[in-house]
A protein has these predicted regions:
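A non-transmembrane, solvent-exposed segment enriched in polar/low-complexity residues
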Residues: 14-160
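Bacterial Sec-dependent N-terminal signal peptides
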Residues: 1-19
Length: 314
């Protein structure tokens, strides 16, 4: 009996738990959705003051989204409680209690969003185009954002899980680096200006160090950046060799390009994200079957990825 009880307690201790109280929300249902897995999710009937609690197994940093817009970051085994107050459709406040490392990380993530608001730093590049933000301004602001976030996270780096720090840093870097690669070109094409791909453009990504930690590779935005960066490097190499370049525009060609461009955990995670996105798009899913088999045979390291892909194909 003692052994069984100890085993039960041990298993329960490994659970990751999110609980929430929500006030002022006008919807009928409360939704918890996991960024990393479509199979980690819960829903509850709206009842102001009631604690909505959900426990799940996690092996890596996990970002849960409440009601499609409020992010909560957890390490495996963390337990965190959040009180969210709405004013109409807008979130008035989010207050965290629970595991110290998770609370610190989530407060830091809130501060990052506040920095963006203060800087008027838009998350969507199409919004920048609509507001006629000049490429020079976007690049300057992206560099400032990177510096501000690094400074902020340095203050808590010894007090929270490194993987959560890496997750937040990776998300910020993804936004900045994608801006470097895409916004000058988008702006020039929209305004019918000469090509933006001069020497200064290719220098923007010089000195970038790619991340391969669990925290960074758990961040979907960072994996999206890795995919885009693979094509950026291929184009740069082609131009340096005097060759034309056409960015891959089919699922299979993207898969081949990314598989060639990376190694190890970075390749594993980027390919997983590409395949996962294709399957979840629901279009010609049968095309994913041979690709998944090739991925499992040649590139898969994180077995959670292959298991999730198999579930998605069922």
């Amino acid at each position: 009996m003692f052994f069984v009880q100890c085993m039960t307690n041990s298993v329960w201790a490994q659970k990751t738990t999110l609980s929430a109280e929500i006030y002022g929300y006008g919807g009928d249902m409360i939704y918890f959705d996991c960024v990393q897995s479509p199979f980690i999710r819960a829903e509850f009937h709206t009842n102001p003051g009631e604690e909505h609690l959900y426990s799940f197994d996690a092996t890596e940093p996990t970002c849960m989204i409440i009601n499609g817009r409020n992010n909560v970051l957890l390490s495996p085994g963390d337990s965190i409680h959040v009180v969210i107050r709405y004013d109409g459709r807008n979130v008035q406040s989010m207050n965290f209690t629970g595991a110290d490392r998770a609370v610190l990380a989530n407060r830091a993530m809130q501060k990052v969003e506040n920095i963006k608001k203060q800087m008027r730093y838009k998350n969507q590049l199409l919004t920048c185009l609509a507001l006629d933000v000049k490429p020079e301004a976007r690049i300057r602001d992206s560099k400032i954002l990177l510096a501000k976030v690094d400074s902020l996270l340095e203050t808590i780096s010894q007090k929270t899980d490194k993987s959560l720090i890496d997750y937040i840093k990776a998300g910020t870097e993804a936004a900045a680096y994608t801006s470097f690669m895409e916004y000058p070109v988008m702006y020039a094409e929209t305004h019918k200006l000469p090509s933006a791909k001069g020497d200064d453009y290719w220098k923007l990504m010089e000195g970038v160090n790619l991340r391969d930690s669990k925290g960074a590779l758990a961040c979907p935005e960072y994996l999206g950046f890795l995919m885009r960066y693979s094509f950026f490097l291929d184009e740069k190499k082609a131009l340096e060799s005097g060759n034309d370049y056409k960015m891959p525009d089919t699922f299979e060609d993207m898969y081949a390009s990314i598989a060639k461009g990376y190694k190890g955990a970075q390749r594993d995670a980027a390919l997983y994200m590409l395949i996962c996105n294709f399957i979840r798009s629901g279009k010609k899913v049968e095309r994913a079957i041979p690709v998944v088999e090739d991925y499992k045979a040649n590139y898969n390291i994180n077995k959670d990825y292959s298991e999730l892909l198999e579930k998605l194909l069922q």
